[in-house]
UniProtKB/Swiss-Prot annotation:
Name the record gives this protein: 3-dehydroquinate synthase
Cofactor(s) recorded in Swiss-Prot or TrEMBL: Co(2+); Zn(2+); NAD(+)
Organism expressing this protein natively: Prochlorococcus marinus (strain MIT 9303)
GO terms classed as biological process: amino acid biosynthetic process; aromatic amino acid family biosynthetic process; chorismate biosynthetic process
Upper taxonomic lineage: Bacteria, Bacillati, Cyanobacteriota, Cyanophyceae, Synechococcales
Stated family: Belongs to the sugar phosphate cyclases superfamily. Dehydroquinate synthase family.
Length: 372
């Protein structure tokens, strides 16, 4: 991937009535995190607990701490395990322990430096420490940059399902340094591309077409810096617009769950960590695409376009061998169930989806049969 140089940061507002904030892309990146915190109104001199994992802390931890110190903050670094199988209340308790040792106060700050798992756990720890302190997201994976870090969803997994324990807790700032993708493993990059494709299907047909026109998508080295910036901007803008209009998933925000209903089943039944989150979402998008064809909501050509783009990104498209009745049982425990009815985000065309709560169990069985 080309070196990312962008002196002028791109600033995308998340226009919430009670606590608006910015998604900042580029600029000085992690070198400027201290300045960006001050711009966001976080007081100089406060204690800051930076939470990261070893793979991220090694190349970027000192850089982040130095920037915070230079701007007058008092940072401490906590390094945790960050696999999906570590996304548990026990791991959050470790963050709470570090917050206690650092004597964090209500005016203090937690900073998530890492991917989606670090962001989810740190956000939840901040939401529950002293009944809620501020959090800043510094995403270092593509998936976190375009999705997980934006919007305030935090939480951990339960043996019965993904993200069943959590809270809405909006960050004070999201700072995206695209240069951190230079050290991201290719598999993680591909997983993030699933969420980018999702935005194309649910509301940005032009983004979908842009991705279709790129010869190869499955490694970061295949994207020029200006193209990567465009992908990050369009994805962050898509997420921020939805969150700004529906912060707590009362309506429109549910479209962001496209591919996630089936995807969470795959993660739960295959075991957390077997698939990366983005990989499971990719499988889920193919599955719900098949469901949409069976319901005659969209045509086979569009379903095939989606499937081809997902495959081009190096993502899995095959449904795993799972007992259909176990799938149905797990779906019933999904947090998106409403009034006992299964809710799915169903595509009606590239760039358009509908939220449906009338999907029958027999339709799901038929869909799973077609996928097998």
């Amino acid at each position: 991937m080309s070196a990312f140089v962008n002196i002028d940061a791109q600033r995308i507002p998340v226009a919430l009535s009670h606590q608006p904030y910015e998604v900042v892309i580029g600029g000085e990146g992690l070198r400027g995190v201290g300045k960006e915190l001050r711009r966001a109104g976080l007081k100089e001199g406060i204690k800051v607990l930076v939470v990261s994992n070893a793979d991220v802390a090694e190349p970027y931890g000192d850089l982040c701490l130095q920037s915070l110190s230079d701007s007058g903050y008092r940072p401490t670094l906590l390094v945790i395990e960050a696999g999906e199988d570590q996304k548990t209340p026990v791991s959050v308790a470790l963050i709470h322990d570090a917050a206690y040792e650092a004597k964090l106060e209500r005016g203090s700050l937690m900073v998530a430096l890492g991917g989606g798992v670090v962001g989810d756990m740190t956000g939840f720890a901040a939401a529950t420490w002293l009944r809620g302190i501020s959090v800043v997201q510094l995403p270092t994976t593509l998936l976190a940059m375009v999705d997980a870090a934006i919007g305030g969803k935090t939480g951990v997994n339960h043996p019965g399902g993904k993200n069943l324990i959590g809270a809405f807790h909006q960050p004070r700032l999201v700072l995206i340094d695209p240069s951190t993708l230079n050290t991201l493993p290719e598999r993680e990059f591909r997983a993030g591309m699933a969420e980018v494709i999702k935005y194309g299907v649910i509301g940005d047909a032009a983004l979908f077409q842009l991705l279709e026109g790129i010869p190869e998508l499955n490694t970061p080295s295949q994207l020029h810096a200006d193209l990567l910036e465009k992908i990050l901007e369009r994805s962050a803008l898509a997420k921020s617009r939805v969150v700004s209009s529906d912060e707590r998933e009362g309506g429109l925000r549910a479209i962001l769950n496209y591919g996630h209903t089936f995807g969470h089943v795959v993660e739960t039944l295959c075991g957390y960590g077997t698939w990366l989150h983005g990989e499971a979402v990719a499988i889920g998008m193919v599955a719900v695409g098949e469901l949409a064809v069976l319901r005659q909501s969209w045509n086979r050509d569009d379903a095939n376009r989606q499937k081809s783009l997902i495959a081009k990104a190096g993502l899995p498209i095959a449904w795993p061998k799972l007992d259909p009745e176990e799938v149905l049982y797990t779906l019933q425990g999904d947090k998106k169930v409403k009034d006992g009815k299964l809710r799915f985000v169903i595509p009606t065309g590239i760039g358009n989806v509908e939220i449906k709560n009338d999907v029958s169990r027999e339709e799901i069985r038929k869909c799973l049969s077609e996928l097998s």
